[in-house]
From Swiss-Prot:
Residues 6-149 form the Nudix hydrolase domain. Belongs to the Nudix hydrolase family. RppH subfamily. HAMAP family: Nudix_RppH. Transmembrane segments: none annotated. It comes from Methylobacillus flagellatus (strain ATCC 51484 / DSM 6875 / VKM B-1610 / KT). SUPFAM superfamilies: Nudix. A motif (Nudix box) lies at residues 38-59. Gene3D superfamilies: Nucleoside Triphosphate Pyrophosphohydrolase. Accelerates the degradation of transcripts by removing pyrophosphate from the 5'-end of triphosphorylated RNA, leading to a more labile monophosphorylated state that can stimulate subsequent ribonuclease cleavage. This is RNA pyrophosphohydrolase. It is an enzyme of class 3 (hydrolase). Its EC number is 3.6.1.-. The keyword Hydrolase applies. Keywords: Hydrolase.
């Protein structure tokens, strides 16, 4: 499902623990790390897609997390032409995403990267909220920064990462 501007609707998930560290998944058989994300199927709301993707990619159910916030609008990124399937060229530009900030209220042991028959990740870790972006594929970095910045306001005040100090320090 691609919109008239060439963007595929998608959800992104920033999962944090009680220390406001964020979940990073290592793409299977690759050396890049990313947040869980995935397409919104026809008839799904962004929230329904988020819970489906959370289960498929991380093995977590709704009772394992609490929604802290979501982005107000779609955040978009363009995919480089050489990454686009030949049959999609000309009609597909990239992804438009609604991002969710979730708090893990379950245990680390509830995470299961093998919850689906087609796993996305082969490893995971907790990292500081304002983690360096050098391990994220380049064309997604700006959207990650925008989502992290917008959603940081939903974190517990005394544990909130300091945006003004850290956003300029993110590796480009």
């Amino acid at each position: 499902m691609i919109d008239r501007d060439g963007y595929r609707p998608n959800v992104g998930i920033i999962l944090c623990n009680a220390r406001n560290q964020v979940f990073w998944g290592k793409r299977i058989r690759e050396h890049s790390w990313q947040f869980p994300q995935g397409g919104i199927k026809y008839g799904e709301s962004p929230e329904q897609a988020m819970y489906r993707e959370l289960m498929e990619e991380v093995g977590l159910r709704p009772e394992h997390v609490k929604i802290l916030g979501r982005t107000r609008d779609w955040l978009r990124y363009d995919v480089p032409t050489n990454w686009i399937k030949r049959e999609w060229r000309g009609s597909y530009r990239g992804q438009k995403q609604i991002w969710f900030l979730l708090r893990l209220i379950g245990r680390d042991s509830d995470v299961s990267l093998r919850a689906s028959t087609h796993p996305e990740f082969d490893a995971w870790r907790w990292s500081d909220y304002w983690v360096a972006m050098d391990s994220v594929i380049e064309f997604k970095r700006d959207v990650y920064r925008m989502a992290l910045k917008e959603l940081s306001m939903h974190l517990t005040e005394h544990r909130r990462p300091r945006v003004a100090e850290r956003v300029d320090q993110l590796v480009r």
